[in-house]
Amino acid sequence: MKILFVSYEVYPLAKVGGLADVAGSLPKYLEKEGVSVQIAMPFHKKVKADNIENTGIVITTKHLPEKYSFEIYKTPLPGSGVPVFLFKNDQLIDSDEVYEGTDLALQAIAFSDAVVKFAETLEPDLLHVNDWQPALIPAYISAFYNGKPKTLLTIHNLGYQGEFDKSYFYKTGLPEKLWQEGKAVKNGAFNFLKTGIVTATAISTVSPTYAKEIQTPEYGAGLDETLRALSDRLFGILNGIDYSEYNPATDKRIPVNFDINSLEKKKENKIALQKELGLPVIDVPVIGLISRLVEQKGFDLIEAAAEKILSNDLQFVVLGTGEERYERLFKSLGERFPEKVSANITFNVDLAQKIYAGSDMFLMPSRYEPCGLGQMFAMRYGTIPVVRFTGGLRDTVKEFNPETLEGNGFGFEEYNPDKLLEAVEKAIKIYENKTLWNQLMLNAMNTDCSWDKSAREYIKLYKHVLNSGRDILNA
């Protein structure tokens, strides 16, 4: 089985969000299971790799009215034999940042068409494309290649759809009937993600719960009707995390290594974190939060409940950047409660690891969360998630029961600041019982969040897709 995996970001070459972690991990685990995998991504200016070679191949777009050419570079995905093909066009890919540029829509259109042209040479059985930027790939294959090879479109976050002016549709060279039949349009705009959804052989998203949620008006972001109509080819598979990369026993980014048999050393990471961030070194629960500071993540709940949460004996460590409103919120809390709050309005991978290893709890009160990786990283390091039960958080975090000693975290259902406060205070109460807390840490660290299981699920889905004989464009 040959898979061409297409993503705009791949860790460690270029990372903005969780998609990079998925794209940098899943192909390695597929390779371990015997799948032949290759990756295609734009050659962003921020791409970092030790050995990048120019293949000498130049791919010119095939279907766009205006032609664009990409030089193809190649580098191995670190820790694997998976080749990454980098598509270089400095005219289109003209920003230092992954999701910035003079014309993101045209960049995504040209990249998608170039990948399809390149696939003629690679001859994969299936193209696995991720999010809206390469979502036109299924449309090109459906329109011009009789639906072969097959395509799987994975939606990592339905909130980002790639909506642009209708004029961009005519830059794609795609058949007019896609527009006339409403397959490429939402609210009068050209919608990249919808175009991919209706033309892909199959669609997946990053947790079973989110696959159900996006078929409802509450979570469907205006595409719930489309997704309900296609529910027979919509699947949910949980993301995993790379256990070789995120391993408290070997992680060089944390002060003291530990494992499930030396949990007492976790406390040394907590003390080191308190010292580094200028917090008093005292035995109170440290709650970590690492996130993009955006509305989706539930920070309006924290804003409403902050005073009551901080009236408890605890410390709160924040790391992330995002909307100015929330950056101001956490800076203000840091200034008002300097003994309790450390607000780090930046992104620093090393500090993130220290927070995962040194915190007692990890807060994710998300409004919606397609999968979430933070709770998985946290549990790997014995840090207990406190979450809102939505999307992948519902699939991975189970409420701790002090009677049966089962469960790996704490959560709440209703999107409400009082419910958030209740969940935090429940966690604090269990923290005060060291026997129960030790059991809870063991449960968290024993939770299987590795890619092994997920990779096998994807292989099952690939086989299902390859056996599907649907002509999507004419369906």
Curated annotation (Swiss-Prot):
Sequence positions that bind ADP-alpha-D-glucose: K15
One Pfam family recorded for the sequence: Glycos_transf_1
Any one GO molecular function term: alpha-1,4-glucan glucosyltransferase (ADP-glucose donor) activity
EC number, UniProt record: 2.4.1.21
Gene3D superfamilies (alphabetical): Glycogen Phosphorylase B
Biological processes, Gene Ontology terms: glycogen biosynthetic process
PANTHER family according to UniProt: ALPHA AMYLASE DOMAIN-CONTAINING PROTEIN, GRANULE-BOUND STARCH SYNTHASE 1, CHLOROPLASTIC/AMYLOPLASTIC
Family: Belongs to the glycosyltransferase 1 family. Bacterial/plant glycogen synthase subfamily.
Protein name per Swiss-Prot or TrEMBL: Glycogen synthase
Species this chain originates from: Kosmotoga olearia (strain ATCC BAA-1733 / DSM 21960 / TBF 19.5.1)
Lineage: Bacteria, Thermotogati, Thermotogota, Thermotogae, Kosmotogales
